[in-house]
Amino acid sequence: MVSVILRSRNEERYVGFALQSLHDFFGYDLEIVLVDNESTDNTIRVVNSFEYLNIKKITINKNDYTPGKSLNLGLESCNGEIVLCMSSHCQITNLNLDKIQAKLKDNVAVWGKQIPIWDGKKVSRRYMWSNFKDVDQTNYFCELENRYFLHNAFCFYKREILIENLFDEKYSGKEDRYWVNDMINKGHQVYYDSEMICNHFYTDNGATWKGIG
C-alpha cells in the first residue's frame, strides 16, 4: 500500500483535483494523510466529500508550521512501505507505480516532472523550471541553486528511510533540497522519473514557481 502525505492551507480550489487523481491512479488501495495548516476556506469540506477514500485528517497550528514539521507529522500516521509527498495543488497525469517501486530498490526517493498550470491553461515554457527535464536522471544537480535537487510537491520515498532521516523542521522552505543533499552526501541515490508527471497549479503570487509551493 502507498501512503500519501498532503499538506494543505486554503486549497479548496485545487485539493479536489489532487484527491481525484490519486483515486484514478491508485484506486482504493491507498492511505491519505491530510496535514492541514488551519485552513479558513472550504478545503476540509471538499476533502470530506471524498468519503469513499481512506483519508486521515491532522491539523497543525499555523503559528507552529514549517514544511518539514508538517511532513514529519504526517509520516507518523503513515503505514505504507512507500510514501508519496504531494502538494494539495498538484494533479497526477501520468504515473507507473511498477517503475517507481523498481527504482526505489536502489534509490531513497523518486521525484517527477511538474507542468505549471494557471486557471486551466498551461503556462508558457519560458516560465518552466529547467529542473523538470524530459530525461531521467540520477542525483540531479541544479546549476542555478548549486546543489542537488528534489521537489516534495510530487515525490515518492521509502517510509523506513524517512523515519530514519526526518526532514529538518527549522527551514521555512526547500526542506526537500536540504534533505536530498544530506542523503547524497551520505552515499545514497535519488532518481528523477521524467515519465512521472503532475500538473502543478501555482498560487496567485507565483509562489510555486519560486520554490515555495
What are these regions (language model features)?
Residues 172-179:
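Acidic donor-binding loop at a coil-to-helix junction in glycosyltransferase catalytic cores
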